[in-house]
């Protein structure tokens, strides 16, 4: 399935039904009063978040969404039928902006969460509404009002608790496939991963934690280089960052600093996010020429974060690293609960 994480669409709520001009025509009542009913309300456009969608792909093929118009009023003071609301399903994690003003309209993060995007127009008034002591037989009515119309920009930010970040070819896809049932495309060249991949990693308790393999970031990502903005956006909702570094690189410290500088430049608190650093591919390192422990110590001093020596291929060091992930997530959850009750 193709992964689409941005879309622009147009939505239009239904027009209110027209009020009508009608008069009572009953036997023995030759000059009945006005009885034209009001028009029905136009249908609204409502967005709802659902769990079974993972992409905005559907919006690539359909760009205009319109709710039903309200029905015309009827005789005998009957109000027209209301237009049916249009329910638009989006993935959990979808942020909705007004494309013309840039205003944030809503952020749908929970299953079944709903957001009224465009309200239906009010129904027009029938002539019975205008009956008065001065006008006993009004011969006019009002049309229904148009529904709201909006041009929207949709952005999907993945809902993952742990974001795996690093330079291209650091082994992120191999790691997520080792930890979960996810099977991303893996190859021995940079930029194999062009879309984020999600994998569910099970705790010893059986509970699942969602990890996101974020496509490789490059220098200048915060300025948009290499689709950097698109990729960095998916890190915003994560609680923990797992910074993966290729231990076979000719300059591990440079690689670490490159990613950290991009996180700081992008902002939105990414550089302050709880982090774990992992030196990957240690199975491919010549221990006689490379002092991995010394590199780990340097990274620890730089990052002030726990550093692990791992191999995603052989699974060496993965369990201790995961235990640290679970511990940090527990801390974050406890802090969030404390904030709620403060």
UniProtKB/Swiss-Prot annotation:
It holds the Pfam family MMR_HSR1. Its cofactor is Mg(2+). GO terms for cellular component: cytoplasm. Its main location: cytoplasm. Keywords: Cytoplasm, GTP-binding, Hydrolase, Magnesium, Metal-binding, Nucleotide-binding. It comes from the Bacteria. Its EC number is 3.6.5.-. It is found in: Cytoplasm. The keyword tRNA-binding does not apply. Residues 1-159 form the Obg domain. InterPro entries: G_OBG (IPR031167), GTP-bd (IPR006073), GTP-bd_Obg/CgtA (IPR014100), GTP1-OBG_CS (IPR006074), GTP1_OBG_dom (IPR006169), GTP1_OBG_dom_sf (IPR036726), OBG_GTPase (IPR045086), P-loop_NTPase (IPR027417). The keyword Magnesium applies. GO terms for molecular function: GTP binding; GTPase activity; magnesium ion binding. Mg(2+) binds at residues 173, 193. Residues 160-330 form the OBG-type G domain. GTP binds at residues 166-173, 191-195, 213-216, 280-283, 311-313. One of its GO terms (biological process) is ribosome biogenesis. Coiled coil: none annotated. Transmembrane segments: none annotated. Monomer. Belongs to the TRAFAC class OBG-HflX-like GTPase superfamily. OBG GTPase family. PANTHER family: DEVELOPMENTALLY REGULATED GTP-BINDING PROTEIN-RELATED, MITOCHONDRIAL RIBOSOME-ASSOCIATED GTPASE 2. HAMAP family: GTPase_Obg. An essential GTPase which binds GTP, GDP and possibly (p)ppGpp with moderate affinity, with high nucleotide exchange rates and a fairly low GTP hydrolysis rate. Plays a role in control of the cell cycle, stress response, ribosome biogenesis and in those bacteria that undergo differentiation, in morphogenesis control. This is GTPase Obg.
